[in-house]
UniProtKB/Swiss-Prot annotation:
Pfam family, one: Meth_synt_2
Pathway assigned in UniProt: Amino-acid biosynthesis; L-methionine biosynthesis via de novo pathway; L-methionine from L-homocysteine (MetE route): step 1/1
Positions annotated to bind Zn(2+): 665, 667, 689, 750
Reaction catalysed by this enzyme: 5-methyltetrahydropteroyltri-L-glutamate + L-homocysteine = tetrahydropteroyltri-L-glutamate + L-methionine
EC number: 2.1.1.14
Functional description taken from the UniProt entry: Catalyzes the transfer of a methyl group from 5-methyltetrahydrofolate to homocysteine resulting in methionine formation.
Catalytic residues (UniProt): 718
Sequence positions that bind L-methionine: 455-457, 508, 623
Binding sites annotated in the UniProt record for L-homocysteine: 455-457, 508, 623
GO process annotations (BP): methionine biosynthetic process; methylation
Cofactor: Zn(2+)
InterPro entries: Cbl-indep_Met_Synth_N, Cobalamin-indep_Met_synthase, Met_Synth_C/arc, UROD/MetE-like_sf
Protein name per the record: 5-methyltetrahydropteroyltriglutamate--homocysteine methyltransferase
Length: 777
């Protein structure tokens, strides 16, 4: 008997983003369904055979998806809302993509950031609501269920893919999203209705799927219930027991490997170990301490899947150190009761480090992407089965890399540590309370009531993207690129003056991305060429890799600000990304607490804020688009996170005089549960997304008696639609019913980078007119 290895899921997009390009060609009508399905099949085949060749015994199938695995599950159980016009039978591609992206043929709205949950497809039949998958930057489509919902098995995808792999000689372990998590992720429009109440109706379909898999020859099936990493009620735990009792009964032929990830089981551990399943997966990266408890609490026959390799990050593991922990477990439990695995699906990591030819070799040896993580598992299994000596060279290389990383001067900058140690509480406080600052700012800025502004970026046109690409490839010179960007900036500034905006922006034409742009100028960040990770559907992001102590060698935005301000007498906002957002949209160090890394970034941003002020900026905006999405999965951990997140923002923002106005921006609208933290950030002005909620979400601010100024977005930039003046005056009136007039700003709900100029111009002209009318009324 030997220790085997499993992966819980592998990236779907392809090493060269083949799936993305196939999807987009299909959506654009350039290729047909066969071409798309061929690419998908080819990717699956390569993924299976590659994992099998690397020594994975439990190769997953049905982890592939054309768009999203939660959507696949909804389709599998026939949960297709009436709006999509489905009349039973197999769900065709048109219906599937309508659920994913809204109306056919309509281009997906682009997100404003990797974690932005803005659903594509603005008009026509809307897409299902898209939201973040637990605490990742992956977005799933929330199933929409209604009271009395009927379920029926309407897809043979799990069985088809199992057979497809079997035909290639790979015996897979199919993956299903578990019924309880599926229902917990679902949304409903019916008030007071809980989708979990549909469990009894749903279970028979799962029973059918499991029997189908058994008939096709599957022995193990992986069933994912990551809801076990959340706070659950006693009722929910009881429902899990009921569900797995029923499923074991319905399909006695298959052995279930129950997984949860993104954290420990915590309070749910006793429930999990006692479910009538044959295997249980533990996320030992996020919850290393749960191993002992699980060993002690579980019956001897339960197979434990030990998630020891980090599926959420890019660091190479220290294999000898892991073996020190694993060897006693194997000795105690028996090799046939232990499976080695990544902590979660590898969906959240880039695919292959071998594609990175430009990475600094020193940094590169510290990294492992999906393929390298599987290789590491193979080394671990070999060492456990054949002794450490049988893989001595691989173990030594791993230990060597770990030692090098622990001591590298590239990572450890004593000056950063000293500076951090010298941070005093007054550095996180503005000099005076808001009321006093407001007066100082009023005197300095002299703005009209309901001042108008935008969130920062203007359209990233084809020309802008082409110029950037040409510059990156060395096809155009520094000077040519710079001249081009200056011209774009000058045009944007002149246009803003003409339409009568009160507070201007330079337009962010020089920025590739709101995090990458800063990461590239800060010490401590590295970037990949092919390190793509799926964000949703065909959209992928390449998160920066935060590998070392962060500092700011030189000013990052000051020259652009100076240039832009030199073109106008109106105030030009300095435009920065905040420390929490930079942190949350990067791969972060695993050798330093997140909060320490965040404070380091905060100090670097603070330097920039202070320099902008010294250069003359009267208004500086520090975007924290990703503050909310960093919230931990369990409520009990929220306060600690919010404390250091807010403190980091304040550290970045508080180095300026009272008369300098600090803005922040957040791309979402759910503030109810974090309003105290928003208040504690102590920004002078916050702009938020509200356009789609008819200003109702302002109630959170009203209830909190939020003292400072707010720019509730008066129109949705995620759609090309140009809002009429009246629409925005109505929204402004609704806002004024809730807040004092002098608290309000007028702005769109996010940056305009994904829009085109004609609609942007028309919308802003209307917005300025709406503000004028509102002032007069
Ligand atoms: N200043 C950024 C922009 O306008 C903010 C983007 C965001 O919040 N996602 O593009
Ligand atoms: Zn935004």
């Amino acid at each position: 008997m030997t220790v085997t290895i499993a992966t819980l899921g592998f990236p779907r997009i392809g090493p060269k983003r083949e799936l993305k390009f196939a999807l987009e060609a299909y959506w654009a009508g350039k290729t047909d369904a066969d071409a798309l399905l061929d690419t998908a099949r080819d990717l699956r085949a390569k993924t299976w055979t590659r994992q099998a060749a690397l020594g994975v015994a439990h190769v997953p199938s049905n982890d592939f998806s054309l768009y999203d695995h939660v959507l696949d599950t909804a389709v599998m159980v026939g949960a297709i809302p009436a709006a999509y016009g489905w009349s039973g039978g197999t769900v065709d591609l048109a219906t599937y993509f309508a659920m994913a992206r809204g109306d056919q043929g309509r281009p997906a709205a682009e997100a404003c950031g990797p974690g932005c949950g803005h659903a594509p497809g603005a008009d026509g039949v809307p897409a299902l609501e898209m939201t973040k998958w637990f605490d990742t930057n992956y977005h799933y489509l929330a199933p929409e269920l209604s009271p009395g919902q009927a379920f029926a098995l309407t897809s043979s995808k799990p069985v088809d893919e199992f057979l497809e792999a079997k035909a290639l000689g790979v015996h897979t372990r199919p993956v299903l999203l578990g019924p309880v998590t599926f229902l917990k992720l679902a949304k409903t429009k019916a008030e007071g209705f809980s989708p979990l109440s549909l469990l009894s109706a749903l279970l028979p379909v799962y029973g059918q799927v499991l029997r189908g898999l058994a008939a096709a020859g599957a022995d193990w099936v992986q069933i994912d219930e990551p809801c076990l990493a959340l706070d659950l009620t006693d009722f929910e735990r009881a429902e899990l027991r009921r569900a797995y009792g029923a499923l074991t009964h319905a399909a006695p032929g298959v052995r279930l490997m129950l997984t949860s990830y993104f954290g420990g089981y915590g309070e749910n551990l006793a429930t999990a170990v006692n479910l009538p399943v044959e295997g249980l997966h533990l996320d030992l990266v996020r919850a290393p301490d749960e191993l002992e408890a699980a060993l002690a609490a579980s019956r001897e026959s339960l197979v434990l899947s030990l998630g020891v390799i980090d599926g959420r990050n890019v660091w190479r593991a220290d294999l000898p150190a892991l073996l020190d922990r694993l060897e006693p477990v194997v000795a105690r439990r028996g090799s046939d009761r232990v499976v080695l695995a990544p902590s979660c699906s590898l969906l959240h990591t880039p695919i292959d480090l071998d594609l990175e030819t430009a990475l600094d070799p020193e940094i590169r040896q510290w990294l492992a992407f999906a393929v390298q993580k599987v290789e590491a598992l193979a080394v671990l299994a070999q060492a456990l089965n054949g002794g450490r000596a049988s893989v001595a060279a691989a173990l030594e290389a791993s230990a060597q890399a770990a030692r090098a990383r622990a001591t590298s001067p590239r990572i450890h900058d004593p000056k950063v540590a000293e500076r951090l140690a010298a941070v005093t509480p007054d550095m996180t406080r503005r000099r005076s309370p808001y009321d006093q600052r407001r007066e100082a700012q009023r005197a300095r800025l002299n703005l009209p009531p309901l001042p108008t502004t935008t969130i920062g970026s203007f359209p990233q046109t084809t020309e802008v993207r082409q110029a950037r690409a040409a510059f990156a490839k060395g096809q155009i010179s520094d000077a040519t690129y710079e001249a081009f960007l200056r011209q774009e900036t000058a045009r944007a500034v002149a246009w803003q003056e003409t339409v009568g905006l009160d507070v201007l922006v330079h337009g962010e034409f020089e920025r590739n991305d709101m995090v990458q742009y800063f990461g590239e100028q800060l010490a401590g960040f590295a970037f990949t060429q092919s390190g793509w990770v799926q964000s949703y559907g065909s959209r992928c992001v390449r998160p920066p890799i935060l590998f070392g102590d962060v500092s700011r060698p030189a000013p990052m935005t000051v020259d652009w600000w100076r240039y832009a301000q030199g073109l106008t007498r109106r105030p030009m906002k300095g435009m920065l990304t905040g420390p929490v957002t930079i942190l949350n949209w990067s791969f972060v160090r695993d050798d330093l607490p997140r909060e320490t890394a965040c404070r380091q970034i905060a100090l670097a941003i603070r330097d920039e804020v202070v320099d902008l002020e010294a250069t003359g900026a009267a208004i500086i905006q520090i975007d924290e688009a990703a503050l909310r999405e960093g919230l931990p999965l369990r409520r009990g951990d929220w306060d600690a996170y919010l404390d250091w997140a807010v403190e980091s923002f304040r550290l970045a923002a508080s180095g300026v005089a009272d008369a300098t106005q600090i803005h922040t921006h957040m791309c979402y609208s759910e503030f109810n549960d974090i309003i105290a933290a928003i208040g504690a950030m102590d920004a002078d002005v916050i702009s938020i997304e509200t356009a789609r909620s008819k200003m109702e979400l302002l109630d959170a601010f009203v209830g909190y008696a939020y003292p400072a100024q707010i720019g509730p977005g008066v129109y949705d930039i995620h759609s090309p639609r140009v809002p009429a003046v009246e629409e925005m005056t109505t929204l402004l009136a609704a806002a004024r019913q809730r807040l004092a007039g002098e608290q309000l700003w007028v702005n769109p709900d996010c940056g305009l980078k994904t829009r085109k100029w004609p609609e942007t111009q028309a919308a802003i002209v209307n917005m300025v007119e709406a503000a004028r009318r509102a002032r007069a009324s």
